[in-house]
Amino acid sequence: MRKIPFSPPDLSQAEIDEVIKVLKSGWITTGPETKLFESRIAERCHTEKAVCLSSQTSCAELTLRILGIGPGDEVIVPAYTYTATASIIYHVGAKPVMIDCKSGSFEMDYDKMEAAINHNTKVIIPVDLAGVVCDYDRIFEAVERKKSVFNPRNELQEKFGRVIVMADGAHAFGAQWHGKMCGEIADFTNFSFHAVKNMTTAEGGAAVHRSHDGIDEEDMYKRYMLLSLHGQTKDAYQKNKVASWEYDVVDTQYKCNMTDVLAAIGVAQLERYDQMLDRRHQLIKLYNEEFKDLPVQVLNHCDENHRSSGHLYFVRFIGKDADYRNKFYNMMADHGVMCNVHFKPLPLLSAYSKRGFKITDYPNAYNMHKNQLTLPMNSTITDDEAWYVIETFKQCMKTLK
């Protein structure tokens, strides 16, 4: 029986060579390779700076802390997302406000999102699910209309003068929307380079932000550096470079820096990224063509206004329930095709249900989840393997009527 894994990393000799170069350099923790990777991320995203850390989660949490989000504040998130989007809100002591999906869509109901904005709201975290960029025109229209209720608690928030939009771009590195790159659309964007992502450093993430009047780019970068390395004023590479051991610790902070070994993987991945992204879109086009006459709903990954990062290929079985989806998942696995489900809406998870969130309050999110399946679709899949996925999918549909 054939085996089609869900999402293996696409690694070549180039990544191996870059890692070996770093290992032989004598410097393997945060240093010149991480800084090189940051500069190339910023170049790709059309931003002044990028900060590379240990995960998207650490990038997002540190962004909230830099913005001064804390007790008494509210942060709006979709109910349909992974826990990392919302757990960071609890980490900083704020309150997550969950918004249901719009009927028939994986995105938030933007009317409900706008209605939820009040004087406690400080941040909205849209999620670019599967690498498809959200409707940021609608989101920014909402925060502009609600400017009068915005209640800034510090100087940085005052500079924005409205609710801040911080994108969860964990799936969306390389996506484009109305001629802009993901990373230059929202006020802040945080990416994931986890092993299953469409570009990887094994573990890691990056924070970027678009330029804003009154915000000093270098100062913002230094804030991330302090927060990510114990509040220490010099990292090990800086101390070694200037031959000065003296440093200060200005606050009790965190430890979530990226290492040069992991950054090396990312540097090599970026060189190949356009090719990998093109391959994903070739597969999306093939799947779309083969599934167009089947009773399934798929995401729109590309049109004249946007091109996704091609991270995940969702299908929804129209008119079916979770039992059907689960049987379909198992049948695909029996034929060696490993699929996945993205995601359980947050109120279905114990961490959130015990905090009072009820899935019955989010019926659209549940309806999107109950018959959703994610097919293997990545840049390592050959044409022959893709056709096997397609043929197996069609056979399972015939069997499970």
Regions found by a protein language model. Give the residues of each.
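N-terminal "arm"/small-domain region of PLP-dependent enzymes with the aminotransferase-like
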Residues: 1-27, 32, 248-250, 376
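Phosphate-binding glycine-rich loop
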Residues: 27-74, 88-90, 98, 147-151
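PLP-dependent aminotransferase-like
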Residues: 65-169, 176
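Conserved active-site segment immediately N-terminal to the catalytic lysine
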Residues: 153-200, 245-249
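Active-site PLP attachment segment
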Residues: 171, 184-234, 260
